[in-house]
Amino acid sequence: MMYRIRVVLTVLVFPLLCFGQLTDKQSFEVDSVLSKMTLQQKVGQLFMVAAYSNQGIEHQREVESLARTYHIGGVIMMQGGPKRQLHFLQRLHNASSLPLLVGQDAEWGQAMRLDSTYKFPTSLTVGAANDIVLTKDLGKALAFECKRVGVHISFSPVLDVNTNPTNPIIGARSFGSTVQGVSAHGIAQIQGLQGNDVLACGKHFPGHGDTQQDSHKTLPKVDRSLAELKQMEWVPFKAAVDHGVGSIMIAHLNIPSLEPSGKPTSLSKKVITEVLKNQWNFKGLIITDALNMKGVSEYASPGKLEVEAFKAGNDILLFPMNVPAASKGLMTSFTSGELSIEELDRRVKKILIAKSITRSYEDWNLSKKFSLETTLTSLNQGRRSLNEEVSFKIIAAAATALPNGTAAMPIKELDRKFIHISLGDLTDNSIFKAYLDRYKEMSHFTGSDTPLEAARASDVIIVSFHQNTKNPWKRYKLNASEFKLISELSSMGKSMYVVHFANPYGILTYPSLKGNQQVISMYENNHVAQLLAPQFLFGARAMKGILPVELGTWGKAGDSRLIQSIQRLKYGRPFEVGLSEAPLDRIDSTMSHAIKVGATPGGQILVARRGNVVYQKSFGTHTYGGKDVGWKDLYDLASITKITATLPGIMHWYEKQPLLLKTTLGNHTNRLAGSDKENLVIEDVLAHQSGLAAWIPFYLKTIKTDSIKDYWYTDLDVEGFVRIRPEMSIRTEVRDTMFSMLAKSELSGSDYRYSDLGYYLFQEMLEERFNEPLDQWVTNTIYAPLGAQRLTYTPLKNGFLLDEIVPSEEDSYWRNSTVHGTVHDMGAAMLGGVAGHAGLFANSNDLGKMMQMYLNRG
């Protein structure tokens, strides 16, 4: 693994929009603007002020005033919403005499700061995915999201190597705990951002990964020697500089090996000028971390603090607490000669260059003439589906089976009893439960008060730990009752699977698991992670993610347990199988129209391609105005029974006796002795070219007269009768009558004619062969191993509730009632609901499993 990443570092040399690489026209314009600026304007360019689009008009006017009066160079957009941000930026651009450089913390997209925006996976998830191409694609998607809301510089990626599991502020914001991983993914994300006209910012130099404290609240101390810093913390930053990163953010840290005085690194000339500028020859922007943070704000007052930051070598002073005081302090220092105006010109020129190579000038000009919201939205349309694609791919690639697992993976045997227990933040784990049930329906329990008897009575225990991953630096951990429950479950000796939907450092708080166990880290707790996790458990997808961090006895960084797919049906997205979403969207409108005009009250539709369900929806109601259709609800499959119950039996037999298809029905069942049907060749019957009639309305013989009806039917459930519907039973001897009628029916040559009748005969043949009723054989041999629990004959007898079954018909010719819960086909109903040609019920999900089994060739 380490070798592979080292190779990646040597070959990742893509064209970058290098900082300072200008056309002659751009260079002339920058010099021209700089030559006309007053000292006040130049000083103002150093400030990047906080702007909140969720605050009121007074705040907006205050920031506008700073733009007009102090000529601030930019703003860092904080909390708010995308539309409000664009409206605010339009006002600020109009208030500013020069273009503004707009920055935002957008490590996982604008969702880090803005409501109703797309949240991408965290950097730690990206590190686990271990796919440099995906990381670059993520950078590209992040760039488009930035441009959509008027942002020119994204304060990302985090280049800190998170070697301290208890780090209170970095955590999942880092790509991991190895210099190779952080370097490779950092470079790739920088390329994705800057290759799409958004300036990247590597942070938090000289390295915030090995801290016990949060620099927002205090000045953290890093006890690393210079040699250790060079071997660990500095490696990703140096790699980023060598690959053209546009800016570096300086952290507020106390690192005695660099600055024995205890001065914050953000104010240290030794760190910024001597290392970054002189030793590394970094030409890009150098930006302080926010100056309102306790790690630096208590060191000096506004006015003095900004002077110290400039002396250290910073170009942009981020989030100054008091712009008037800061401006006054800097102006005084420049006019007195304490600070060099020539140096100021060099730094302001770098800021102007940054504006020139991003969309700063374009957005400033647009704001004067057009709606910034309308223009930027139209320029960046169609991105949401691509955002979802790259996020889906990353989360799918990241899922990690911890290397110390011993339980069988994937879970193959489904004819066992399963239980699922949810722990942690249980706000919404419905998707995980629903997709577990798509593979194997099971009992679901919530919380640490789960009855242990239920777990003891099961064969397989699945535990899921969920946490809100809104703040990825948090290290979620088990509480005492959850710890106790997992310990007790582990001691039962069952096959146990723990799926961790949270920051993986929380796994360090788990008890040691005994016996057959496997922990899976999903890193995220969103709908995609919950959709994918069951697929990894049950082998629909291969699992190849790596641990991006050290987890003690649970595994080392770079380790994993690679799990192969066993080709079970997957649930995914159209892009995975080369489909466009547009044709699938038309299914919605077609079904809506069908329901609207009364063609059907509802239905289920499932579309799968290459073993991947890319569309699965339920529509409408069971009856007109009735219960909503759910994905679990059963429909009468009618003639699909032929290929879903009877055909598997013939195929199973054929595997043992390949010449079966050339033999006759009479070779395998005595039902046809003496009739011309005993000479029918099996392959001709299968091909519907045996001459059999299409069907026989057997039921008509039983209702010709009232006396005949009285003979055949009773409303009682008594011995010698089989139920057709509640309060309607028919004599079991009708079976002999039906086969007698079939045996006497006429044959009509070898032309193709679709026929039910051969499948009545196949049922007889198979039941004699297997010495077992067809419904029992196909359930035990085919459906149960497939996990197709909702493929069933006689659903009411097999434990399904009536409201899980969609009615078939209003029968006014024989049963004179709503056909609900029993088979619609008259012949199958007369046989008690089990027949070779009809009788099966299923939902679209389990029918899909059966069809995929055929496509997989078994």
PLM-predicted stretches and their roles:
Residues I170-G171, S257-L258, S378-N380, Y571-R573, ...:
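Flexible glycine/proline-enriched surface loops and loop-helix/loop-strand junctions
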Residues Q21-L66, N278, A300-S580:
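Preference for extracellular/luminal or secreted protein segments
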Residues T38, H59, V75, K83-L100, ...:
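Second-shell residues forming the walls of enzyme active-site clefts
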Residues K677-G858:
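Short, surface-exposed loop or secondary-structure junction motifs
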Residues M1-T23:
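Bacterial Sec-dependent N-terminal signal peptides
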Residues S65-P82, P165-T166, V241-G262, V460-W473:
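Short acidic, glycine-rich surface-loop motifs adjacent to enzyme active sites
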Residues V577-L637, P658-T663, N667, D825:
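Short, conserved catalytic-motif segment at the N-terminal edge
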